[in-house]
């Protein structure tokens, strides 16, 4: 397919891919015949892969996901269902974690200052029984949120400016202030490299 496009309109200057094995092989074969064509990684997929490498080995992350599943099940069909965590997607789940982290942060604040809908009485005991486990993630939630901030800033920059000579330096100056914890600093370096 790539050769067909190249015959019709000339070899592309660059090919953006999501780093899947099949496409990587095709791009590598194409580059043999067209060495001036460069391969660029799709930024959202690249960031999702970096995030997966960061979070998957962390036992706190798997514990958190299991806790979210329990909270989702326990809150269904209750007056607290409006607080249920968003459903996590099996496919491309690391591309959609910002919603889960935002939910956890907002629900954690809700635990401290609950404001129930007008027609729903507050049952503090039930609220704590279902969502109180979020308290044990206070420290790491801030770390995870910083990763989400780094990802969002990177996506915004690349979507607006594209890939260009000097992009690394520009991103470094935008991301360094966001690297305020032990988890974020190496993550910024991985994003930039």
Question: Where do the model's predicted regions map?
Answer:
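Generic preference for hydrophobic/aromatic residues in regular secondary structure cores
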Residues: 2-5, 39, 68, 132, ...
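Acidic/histidine-rich catalytic cores and adjacent linkers
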Residues: 20-25, 73-193
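Helix N-terminus capping/helix-initiation residues
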Residues: 1, 42, 95-96
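Conserved beta-strand -> loop -> alpha-helix junction used to position metal-binding or nucleic-acid-contacting
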Residues: 15, 19-20, 27-72
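Short, basic/hydrophobic alpha-helical segments
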Residues: 1-15
